[in-house]
Amino acid sequence: MGIKIYRPKTSSLRYKTTLSFDELSKGNDPLKSLTKGKVSRAGRDSSGRISVRRRGGGHKRRYREIDFARRDKFGIPARVAAIEYDPNRSPNIALLVYRDGDKRYIIAPKGVKVGDILESGPNAPIKIGNALPLENIPVGKMVHNIELNIGKGGQLVRGAGGYAMIIASDGDYVTVKLPSGEMRMIFKKCIATLGEVGNEDYMNVSIGKAGKSRWLGRRPKVRGVAMNPIDHPHGGGEGKTSGGRHPVSPWGQPAKGYKTRKKNKYSDKFIVKRRNN
């Protein structure tokens, strides 16, 4: 999917770029039975207090229900009926129509086109877009949408352009290299989808103007040094001051290089090599 640039008829268009959406199917509304309403919480928790700052507004969205597991369709071929836009995530989604008539959305892998036949299960061919247990995928193949727990559905590597690589297989576990550089052991019966996640040009898009951030539901970010002392540890001072201390969050936690992972987390035993910091 290419990048569209604009003639600078206004100052805000000078740096704005968008995706061209050439790969999307024309004239396709989302399947109503696979969508549901999504209420914007504007960063508030159940008591109405702000739990995530700088959220609110934005365009109304409907949630597309994605089949991250594909376990109940083992051995049933499916045809890719459409490639659609999803406002709730960075990759596009593919509408699958199974031979038994059922319809599901999945994350659209790179290279999958309308009319392709996809399958899931341990006996599925080694082909981009097919979902297989990790033990059935050859070493060196790229995968995405990787399960961590059997039956829970894919949790790892779901963002646009992402992929992991099968490094080794030993006993009950398969070693996978994740996009962060972390090498992790995952149980061999967990499902993964072959290939890369599509829409790889997403990372090259320039928002270009403040208004587009508002369309996406992102509100302005105020610097700590521009606040009062009551609002932030960096606040206050006469004139423009630099904060006077090492960078911290509004609650005093160091913001640069501070390790936040628990020292004795249960999943440490599955991590062969920590991520690249």
Swiss-Prot record:
<dbReference type="InterPro" id="IPR022671">
    <property type="entry name" value="Ribosomal_uL2_CS"/>
</dbReference>
<feature type="region of interest" description="Disordered">
    <location>
        <begin position="225"/>
        <end position="277"/>
    </location>
</feature>
<keyword id="KW-0699">rRNA-binding</keyword>
<dbReference type="InterPro" id="IPR014722">
    <property type="entry name" value="Rib_uL2_dom2"/>
</dbReference>
<dbReference type="GO" id="GO:0016740">
    <property type="term" value="F:transferase activity"/>
</dbReference>
<dbReference type="InterPro" id="IPR012340">
    <property type="entry name" value="NA-bd_OB-fold"/>
</dbReference>
<dbReference type="Pfam" id="PF00181">
    <property type="entry name" value="Ribosomal_L2"/>
</dbReference>
<keyword id="KW-0694">RNA-binding</keyword>
<dbReference type="InterPro" id="IPR022666">
    <property type="entry name" value="Ribosomal_uL2_RNA-bd_dom"/>
</dbReference>
<dbReference type="InterPro" id="IPR022669">
    <property type="entry name" value="Ribosomal_uL2_C"/>
</dbReference>
<feature type="region of interest" description="Disordered">
    <location>
        <begin position="32"/>
        <end position="58"/>
    </location>
</feature>
<comment type="function">
    <text>One of the primary rRNA binding proteins. Required for association of the 30S and 50S subunits to form the 70S ribosome, for tRNA binding and peptide bond formation. It has been suggested to have peptidyltransferase activity; this is somewhat controversial. Makes several contacts with the 16S rRNA in the 70S ribosome.</text>
</comment>
<dbReference type="GO" id="GO:0003735">
    <property type="term" value="F:structural constituent of ribosome"/>
</dbReference>
<dbReference type="GO" id="GO:0019843">
    <property type="term" value="F:rRNA binding"/>
</dbReference>
<dbReference type="InterPro" id="IPR002171">
    <property type="entry name" value="Ribosomal_uL2"/>
</dbReference>
<dbReference type="InterPro" id="IPR014726">
    <property type="entry name" value="Ribosomal_uL2_dom3"/>
</dbReference>
<comment type="subunit">
    <text>Part of the 50S ribosomal subunit. Forms a bridge to the 30S subunit in the 70S ribosome.</text>
</comment>
<keyword id="KW-0689">Ribosomal protein</keyword>
<dbReference type="Pfam" id="PF03947">
    <property type="entry name" value="Ribosomal_L2_C"/>
</dbReference>
<dbReference type="GO" id="GO:0002181">
    <property type="term" value="P:cytoplasmic translation"/>
</dbReference>
<dbReference type="InterPro" id="IPR008991">
    <property type="entry name" value="Translation_prot_SH3-like_sf"/>
</dbReference>
<dbReference type="GO" id="GO:0015934">
    <property type="term" value="C:large ribosomal subunit"/>
</dbReference>
<comment type="similarity">
    <text>Belongs to the universal ribosomal protein uL2 family.</text>
</comment>
<protein>
    <recommendedName>
        <fullName>Large ribosomal subunit protein uL2</fullName>
    </recommendedName>
</protein>
<keyword id="KW-0687">Ribonucleoprotein</keyword>
<dbReference type="InterPro" id="IPR005880">
    <property type="entry name" value="Ribosomal_uL2_bac/org-type"/>
</dbReference>
